[in-house]
Amino acid sequence: SGNLYEAISVSCNNQSTSVDSKIETEEELIKRALEIHKRVLTLDTHADTPLRMIEPGFDMAERHDPNETGSKVDYPRMKEGDLDAIFFAAFVAQDIRDDNGNSRAKALCVQMIDSIVNSTKKNSDIVGLALNPDDAYDLEKEGKRAIYIGIENGYPIGKDLSNVKLYYNKGVRYITLVHSSNNDLADSATDSKGPEHGGISYFGSKVVNEMNR
């Protein structure tokens, strides 16, 4: 691995290649792509793996057969694929928006976040929790995979702004405001009931400001 700039440079240089340049074969393209892949820092910005991590007996340090478990990511396959860093998303599907629903969503979200953190501690010889961009490069130099944490769907925030800080302190570094249905933060383009807030809600704007603080 190396620097993302190299991949960008290669891409830009290719755009200016003259039409009479040698056309690469598929084999040559794959070879060059693999060379770039090995040279740059590679990052997967979204994986729903935490849904697996809270299942009894699921171990991220073991290589899983996707045909048997449905698992698409684990630490051995991250190494095999030269994937340097990944965002594990704690996903909570949208449900009832009342105190009980918000409480259940928060509890499930915290459970997934804790499972990610515990997994990085248990496997600290091969992975590490990353909290900023530099951490990925530092962990790469140590021969470790960088594990970032995100939240998919702002539902676990409920109506409590202080939850943003709670999740941040636990290691979360991004939150997608909404998923397949409207919530208290914003409208979803796929909600069958149509828009509720006209986009982002007033509370959703406060959440964004808090995340950027």
Question: Can you say where each PLM-predicted feature lies in the sequence?
Answer:
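N-terminal hydrophobic targeting/anchoring segments and the immediately downstream early-domain regions
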Residues: 2, 12-198
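Sec-dependent bacterial lipoprotein signal peptides
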Residues: 1-7
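Alpha-helix-loop-beta-strand connector modules within alpha/beta enzyme cores
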Residues: 195-213
